[in-house]
Every structure is written in structure tokens, then in C-alpha cells.
């Protein structure tokens, strides 16, 4: 199940809220313009291509494109591999998103498989949204956040963009992300 955990931004040891209730998650996040919803899962091949993922969710993807005006959509597929380069690739992919940053674009992600955590630093709180298969999270442009896919990333996520440049982050040079439980720690605590 999806999990929302909230802490003061100065004290990762004090959990103010921890919930798996979808309605409570929706209500808390919508205060900040963040939307959370769920889609019915579809069958996918073991190692799907971006095209196979998008085709499986064509109706939902088209509806989001129509509603939000996105012009580019793709699917990120991360899965453990026997390739000797996999550990280095996984580490590099994870580290790319682990620091606080913002985007000039909304960040909409649907998890078709696996999980990841979006940490939203809003006001004086950190909201860790552990998204799992079936979750669609929409984070408004310019929201300070970071993302952790874990030390062994294993997910399929559909990504939506308003321009052809795709993902462009403006990093904030803070150490806030280092002070909060990681994806692996949140998963282990369940």
C-alpha cells in the first residue's frame, strides 16, 4: 500500500503523520496542490519497453495528456540485471535525484510496477510519499522535493512532460535529504 509520512523539516525523528489510507493521503496532499490517485493495474511483460507500457495504459495516459496539456510521455523502466554495469548504473540513477531540487514543470508519475518515494519539502514539513504500483502522483511545478528509488531500483513509471526537454532539475545545494529515512528504510519499516 501507498504510505505518507510527515515530519518537521528539522526533526526526522518525530513522525507527525504516518498513513496508508488513500483518502487521508489525498486530503493531506491536495492542500499543497499535489494530487494523488490510483489506476487499475494492467499486465506488462517482465521487461517492458516504453511503448508497451504506454500502450497498456493508453486510455489513462490520453486522459492525462488531454486534461493537463502534456506533449511528451515516456516510461522509465528500472530493473535489476545480471549486467556487470548494473550496480554502477543503478547507483548513478539513484544519486541523480537524491538532492533537493525543483522543476519549472509539474512532475506527474504513474507507477505501473514497483515503488519509489517522493519527498516534498513544503513549508516547515517534509512529506514522504511512498508510491507503489497503481499510484499516480502529480507534484506542481517549483515544489521543492527529492526522489529515492532505493539501492536496488525496480520499477516501471510513466512520466509526463510539458516540453521536449523532459526532466530538468534546479538543485538547491542543501543537505535536507540526507537527514530523512531513505526508500530502503521506509520499506523496511512496514
Swiss-Prot record:
Top EC class for this record = oxidoreductase
Q: Which Gene3D superfamilies match?
A: Jelly Rolls
- Catalysed reactions, semicolon-separated: 1,2-dihydroxy-5-(methylsulfanyl)pent-1-en-3-one + O2 = 3-(methylsulfanyl)propanoate + CO + formate + 2 H(+); 1,2-dihydroxy-5-(methylsulfanyl)pent-1-en-3-one + O2 = 4-methylsulfanyl-2-oxobutanoate + formate + 2 H(+)
Q: Where does Ni(2+) bind?
A: 101, 103, 107, 145
- Where are the residues marked Important to generate the dianion as a site? 109
Among its keywords, does the record have Oxidoreductase? yes
Keyword tags: Amino-acid biosynthesis, Dioxygenase, Iron, Metal-binding, Methionine biosynthesis, Nickel, Oxidoreductase
- Taking the record's annotation, the residue ranges forming a coiled coil are none
Pathway, per Swiss-Prot/TrEMBL? Amino-acid biosynthesis; L-methionine biosynthesis via salvage pathway; L-methionine from S-methyl-5-thio-alpha-D-ribose 1-phosphate: step 5/6
Gene Ontology annotations of biological process type? L-methionine salvage from methylthioadenosine; L-methionine salvage from S-adenosylmethionine
Q: How is the cofactor bound?
A: Binds 1 Fe(2+) cation per monomer. Binds 1 nickel ion per monomer.
Which cofactors does the annotated protein need, by name? Fe(2+); Ni(2+)
Q: List the disulfide bonds.
A: none
Give the InterPro entries listed for this entry: ARD (IPR004313), ARD_bac (IPR023956), RmlC-like_jellyroll (IPR014710), RmlC_Cupin_sf (IPR011051)
Q: Mind telling me which residues the site (May play a role in transmitting local conformational changes) is annotated on?
A: 106
Q: Which SUPFAM superfamilies match?
A: RmlC-like cupins
Query: Under which EC number(s) is this enzyme classified?
Result: 1.13.11.54, 1.13.11.53
Q: Where is this site: May play a role in metal incorporation in vivo?
A: 100
Where Fe(2+) is bound, by residue? 101, 103, 107, 145
GO MF terms here are: acireductone dioxygenase (Ni2+-requiring) activity; acireductone dioxygenase [iron(II)-requiring] activity; iron ion binding; nickel cation binding
PANTHER family per the UniProt record, alphabetical: ACIREDUCTONE DIOXYGENASE
Function text? Catalyzes 2 different reactions between oxygen and the acireductone 1,2-dihydroxy-3-keto-5-methylthiopentene (DHK-MTPene) depending upon the metal bound in the active site. Fe-containing acireductone dioxygenase (Fe-ARD) produces formate and 2-keto-4-methylthiobutyrate (KMTB), the alpha-ketoacid precursor of methionine in the methionine recycle pathway. Ni-containing acireductone dioxygenase (Ni-ARD) produces methylthiopropionate, carbon monoxide and formate, and does not lie on the methionine recycle pathway.
Q: Which family does it belong to?
A: Belongs to the acireductone dioxygenase (ARD) family.
Subunit organization: Monomer.
Q: What is this protein called?
A: Acireductone dioxygenase
Q: Which gene encodes it?
A: mtnD
Amino acid at each position: 500500500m501507498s504510505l505518507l509520512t510527515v515530519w518537521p523539516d528539522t526533526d526526522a525523528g518525530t513522525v507527525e503523520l504516518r498513513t496508508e489510507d488513500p483518502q487521508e493521503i489525498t486530503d493531506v496532499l491536495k492542500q499543497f496542490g499535489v494530487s494523488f490517485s490510483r489506476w487499475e493495474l494492467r499486465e506488462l511483460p517482465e521487461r517492458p519497453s516504453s511503448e508497451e507500457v504506454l500502450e497498456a495504459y493508453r486510455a489513462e495516459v490520453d486522459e492525462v495528456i488531454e486534461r493537463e496539456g502534456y506533449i511528451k510521455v515516456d516510461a522509465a523502466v528500472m530493473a535489476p540485471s545480471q549486467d556487470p554495469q548494473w550496480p554502477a548504473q543503478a547507483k548513478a540513477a539513484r544519486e541523480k535525484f537524491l538532492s533537493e531540487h525543483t522543476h519549472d514543470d509539474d512532475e506527474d508519475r504513474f507507477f505501473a510496477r514497483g515503488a519509489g518515494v517522493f519527498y516534498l519539502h513544503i513549508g516547515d514539513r517534509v512529506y514522504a510519499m511512498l508510491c507503489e504500483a497503481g499510484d499516480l502522483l502529480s507534484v506542481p511545478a517549483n515544489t521543492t522535493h527529492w526522489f529515492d528509488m532505493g539501492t536496488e531500483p525496480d520499477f516501471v513509471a510513466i512520466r509526463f512532460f510539458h516540453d521536449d526537454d523532459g526532466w530538468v532539475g534546479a538543485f538547491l545545494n542543501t543537505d535536507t535529504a540526507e537527514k530523512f529515512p531513505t526508500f530502503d528504510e521506509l520499506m523496511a519499516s512496514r
